Amino acid sequence: MVRLSARGYRGFVRKDFRDLFTGDFLGNIEVAVLRGGGEAIKDSRVRWAATYPGPGDQVLFIKKFKAKGWKERVKYLFLPSKAKREWDVSLASREKGVRIPAPVGVMERRRWGFLEESLYISEAVEGAHPVTDFFKERLGRDDSKGEEGRRLIRLLGDTVRHIHENGLFHADMHAGNFLIGKGGEEGLYLIDLHRARIRKGLSQRRRLWNIAQLFYSLDSFLEQGDKGIFFEAYGRKETAPSLLMRVERLACRIKRRHQRSRAKRCLKESTVFTSHRCNGYRVFRRRDVSAGSLMEMIGAHREIVENSPWLLLKNSPKTVVSMVEMPHGSTSRTCVKQYRCATAWGKIKGCFRNSKGKTSWVAANELFRQGISALRPLAYVERARFGFLVESFFLMESPADYLEMDRYLIKSFAHGASGDTLLKKRAFIREFARSIGRLHASYIFHGDLKTCNILARERRGGWDFSFIDLDAVHLGTEVSSRKTLKNLVQINCSIPGFLGYGDRVRFLNWYLEIHPIPMAKRDLIKAVLEESRKRGVVYVSPEGDVREEVLSR
């Protein structure tokens, strides 16, 4: 290794690559890589990566980490940068015999001691692909390739065992961080070691956490037998059911954590979302929705509140809801929900937790991303004064062909008794039950799942369902039997009585196909009926609110 210092970068590089990293190259590395025949494979706000032809037939992998704001700059005054950490762990791992792409160099660029960028360079593995791509492209679920898949699973188990035996804990051990070379005969390479650590020994908890990460990343491809093959190669020939169950619980926990993290992307800068300040407001919006349009729609909402309050869908001290037309001649409608912080206590609470409007914005985007709800959220806008939230607005598309569930049921099934109507009603109940089942199976819980908070519309071949009043939605949470019972009671107590006992039992059967719970069906029905009798049935009809007795068998 030789020391290198050029264009503000300082670090180490292998002697045979010293002439490659000149000042001109490092001065604008992204442009230099492309001009030199390289290829950028990742480019984001915090990381850039590319392959670049080196001396002879060698190909280099160059990764640049960018410091995210002043907090990271201060942190890396005391801790090694991501590139330096990956360099140290890679060298130590290779000494222990772990298969890692050969490190070439590490460099940092600092200003007044504060880190701005860091580079990690390694040799690229010729013809290598992530294990996930290998499964997707060549295996899938094709039984004719089963032996090839089992061989790869054994190789994964053997590789992970070797990694753990040498004390390496990778905090992000998913299948995309394992590279398989041509044919896989040379074994698997572990990459992205900036989140890895070398320890004297790994506890069973850390080992199982890594295995759960791996299983979660291959969830679409692994069956129970495949997991047994993995554990056999890992060194546990007889996998106890309790051990496998523990790994699966950890995988579910990882899934819920990823969902919560992914849902918050709508609060950050990305290719889909942006955030900025506009006229004293803090705006979070989709990039295809202009800030000017948002301000026009909020202005139209205020106009209705001040001059035409009878047009409001809801008007209470805490929330005001209106329906406005989108600007610039669009035929679409937008639902604007305004949250007021009228009391001092409400303003204080807003300092310590997300506002209801922001909760709705995050939940709506996650439901839309997963295809659970078809309504597209447009923006969340808030205004604060002296650090205290004063008001906020949540804007979401609201097509005119959607109806609240209770209104749709009355319109479609209240007066029909023909065979076609009965078949249509049964098909509707099946689709509705599966929609609620998918909601819960996706670790999403709606705390106020009355039918007036569910929208329905017909489409060719079925129905679309969407959810509103999303400030009571919890993401990444296990929907327990207690929470399931709560939602089923809310639905049961807001459905008109002309849907009989048989219809409701069919709904439950189809729901349990998607989201089974550890409770006997008979006990669940009994519990739903008992809780429903305490509340009574209330739903909205064209004539107003209707109250009925709870149906019994």
Residue ranges and their predicted role:
Residues 180-185, 456-462:
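Activation-loop N-terminal segment of eukaryotic-like protein kinases
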Residues 173-180, 449-456:
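Hydrophobic residue at the +6 position relative to the catalytic HRD Asp in the kinase catalytic loop
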Residues 1-37, 248-311:
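Juxta-kinase regulatory segment immediately upstream of eukaryotic protein kinase catalytic domains
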Residues 20-136, 142-143, 155-166, 170-171, ...:
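Conserved ATP-binding subdomain of kinase catalytic cores across diverse folds
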Residues 149-153, 425-429:
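Short alpha-helical scaffold element within the canonical Hanks-type protein kinase domain
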Residues 240-245, 249-278, 517-519, 530-553:
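Terminal substrate-recognition subdomain of acyl/acetyltransferases
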Residues 126, 175, 195, 451, ...:
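Short, glycine/acidic-enriched loop or turn micro-motifs at the edges of active sites
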Residues 189-253, 257, 463-534:
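C-lobe/activation-segment region of protein kinase-like
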